[in-house]
Amino acid sequence: MYPIKKFFLLISVIGFLPAGCVQNENKRSDPSVKSLASVPAWTKEAIWYQIFVERFRNGDRSNDPTPADMYGSYPDKIPKDWKTTPWGHDWYSHEPWLDSIKANGFYSKIQARRYGGDLQGVLNEMDYIQSLGVTAIYFNPLNDSPSLHKYDARNYAHIDRNFGPDPKGDVMIMDAETHDDPATWKWTSADKLFLKIVDEFHKRGIRVIMDYSWNHTGKEFWALNDIRKNGKNSKFVDWYNIIQFDDPSTPKDELKYEGWGGNNPYMPVFRKDIIPPDDKIMPFEGNLHSESLKQHIFSVTRRWLDPDADGNPADGVDGFRLDVAGEVPMGFWREYRKVVRYVNPEAYLIGEIWWLEWPDKLLDPRVFLQGDQYDAIMNYRWYRIARGFFGQADPVLTPAGFVQGIHGINRSLNIENLQAMMNVTSSHDSPRLSTSLFNKTMDKYNAKPSDNPDYKINRPDQLTRKEQMLLLIHQYTFPGAPQIWNGEEAGMWGADDPDCR
């Protein structure tokens, strides 16, 4: 696989001007400008496997989520007869408890589904994952969180309670800590199991990155609960954009704050200093407002990069996927890169740079790939062009249009960044590859039955499978690192989020 990829890589990059190669010093020192800007060599030959733990495998039924664990996620009230959903359940059929949920429609109600996937399930499938030939793992968020997706953190410093073997014991450990003091942080059973998994993957020559959102938390995040309790006197009050404080004299929770996407109460966003203040178009100059918030994020980052803090990052993760990265001011990312590279000069930073204006305008990533922020992005721009040609889907491309499109998105990129791109065909946020090709409408637009009753959700036909094979050949021989969304290797199909999960 590697020789053919290198051969096609050589052909594909003719006409690009590569930047000078830079060697990283593998020692704890302030990174020089050159070492800070370099792209980790291992990322250029990576084959990524993306794991969404809650939906991967249930290896330990004793840690399955309960309604109490889900408190703070949508929907708010879980019926008494709620149970975890059995594996193999028909996605569009209703569990006995589903219609008891007071929520608007099927897609709102299934946010309460839990399958019980956990880290033991990942550990049990190590041989299977290795057999796929992958060399790097991208974990969707693992931080403690009440939701199925974990982008609404309760606690950044710990692995989700239901991903480890002792949820109740882990909660006791977390509750005993001073959350803003890293000196008090302990290792929960879930934390230890994750570190074991990192070690096992490393023994097999497989790298590991974690997914974090430094843009927002969940409504039950410990700092927001402190604001809920102490109001204006909370020392974390400058972390968020607080609109109204809670009135402790009433039973109602009156706390209001800016949420992701506007008024989403389940994902409060951090306060940012945008330069200029009225700038509404990404990317943004500026920074996160609170210095104590940044230091907390940096402490969590160091914790996973070098768990025993001995100066050798071999026991830690190999980088981070950065959620909704374009919504966070670039000044923060410049600081963040320095923190990460100080601990591990070979750590990989990949940003989720996607929409400028949904559903048809994608954000130009060049400003993020100047050596001071990320090494690469999730390359949805590449997939749109590849789908238009190999799948003859909207926007349909001729061979000449395909070549023009590929050159258009790549010609201005540093060759090292291009080689490290994660070339994404499907993910937790988009239709699965075969379903995306089976439907010829615009990708990620009206791409599930609730938005388009004509959207095809049945088994893709043989023509689609042939288109899929051609696109995959292109993916594995094109500059960049191919990515597999868990389940794609088994031929799974599915519409847009959440049907793809």
Predicted regions and their residues:
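Conserved, mostly hydrophobic/aromatic
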Residues: I51, I129, F139, Y156, ...
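Active-site-proximal helices and loops of the catalytic beta/alpha 8
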Residues: V198, H202, I206, N215-H216, ...
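Loop/helix patches that line or flank the sugar-binding groove of alpha-linked glycan CAZymes
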Residues: T43, G59-Y107, W355, Q404-G408, ...
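Aromatic- and acidic-residue-enriched segments that line the glycan-binding/catalytic groove
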Residues: K44, D60-D81, S145-P165, W214-P265, ...
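N-terminal structural segment of carbohydrate-active enzymes
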Residues: K27-R207
